[in-house]
Amino acid sequence: MIRLSSKAVPPICQNDFFGVWLQCASFFSQYIMVNEIWKWYNVKNTTKLRELQMEFHVLAVGDVTGAGGLRSIKKHLRALKKLYHVEFCVVNGENASGVGITPQQADEILDAGADVITLGNHTWNRREICDYLEESRYILRPANFLPSLPGRGWGVYETQIGPVAVANLIGRCNMNFGPDNPFHAADKLLKDVGDIPVLLDFHAEATSEKLAMAYYLDGRAAAVWGTHTHVQTADETVLPKGTGYITDLGMVGPVYSVLGVKPEQSIALFRGELTSRFEWPAGPCRLCGAVFTLDSASGKCTSAERVTVDD
C-alpha cells in the first residue's frame, strides 16, 4: 500500500479553493513519482528478462565411467544445471558400465537430468543396448557407424528457443571403428538437419582430428566438443565464426585413477606385464564438462566455460 503524505493543510487553507488545489497538487505529484518509479522498475526488469531470454545454456558432460561416475552424475548433475541456468544437457554415457552402457544405466543418466546421451567406440560392448538404441530417441550412437546398425546418430529436440539438433560422430585416427569419414558424415547430417543449432559430440582420439572438425564446422555448428580421452583440456574457446569448442570434456569418474582405471593396472600394462581385467577404483569422483552459452537469435556460441565438480 502506498501512503500519501499525512501532513495537514494549514487551517487557513482547509475550506477555501487554494486548500483544495494544494491537496490535489500534493496527491498528483506523489502519484506521478510512484508511477515513474514503477515504469523504471518495469523497464529494468523487462530488459533483464530479454537478456536472459537471448541466452541459451548447454551443458555437455564427459564420459561417465563406471559405478562411481554414475553416482557422481546422480549426485551433482541437477545442482550443476541449476547453478549455470542450463536449459539443455548432453551426457556421454559410453563407459557407464566400465565399457559400454546398459538400458538401466541409460535410464539412470536420463533420470539424473540429461536430455540426451551420446556414445562412442564402446557402444556395442553391451549388446543389450541394441534394442534400447532402436526404441529411444534420447540416446545416440555415432552417425558414421554403418547405417544398418541399430540406433540413430543425430536427433532434433524441442527446447525453449525452438528445435536444437544433437549429433554424435566418431573419429578414425587410432580408432578401429567408424567406417565412414566423419567429415563427410558431418556434411550429410548438417544437410539433413537443416537450419537449426547443431551440437556435436566428436568421440575421437587425436587432438588434431578434433580441432580440424571444429574449424571445418565453424559457423555451421553451434558447439563442437570432444570426448573419449577422459582428460579435460584447457582450450575452451569460441571460434571466429561462432562455434563453441573444447578438445575434450574429460570424464565423470574416479579422481585417483588412470582414465578411470586403477593406476596399478595401467602401470602394469605399460610395463608389459600380464594384467587382469580392468577395475575401477573406489574413492572420490570428479564430474567434468563444459557450458556453452548460445545466442538464441543467431544460434551462435558467445562463450564456453569448463566446469568440474568434485565429490
Please identify what each model-predicted range represents.
Residues 8-9, 44:
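Short linear/disordered segments characteristic of secreted peptide precursors
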Residues 5-6, 26-29:
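Serine residues within intrinsically disordered or low-complexity segments
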Residues 21, 30-35, 39-44, 48-50:
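Short, positively charged and aromatic/hydrophobic N-terminal segments
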Residues 45-311:
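Acidic, metal/ion-coordinating pockets
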Residues 1-2, 12, 31, 41:
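Short, low-complexity segments with poor structural confidence in diverse proteins
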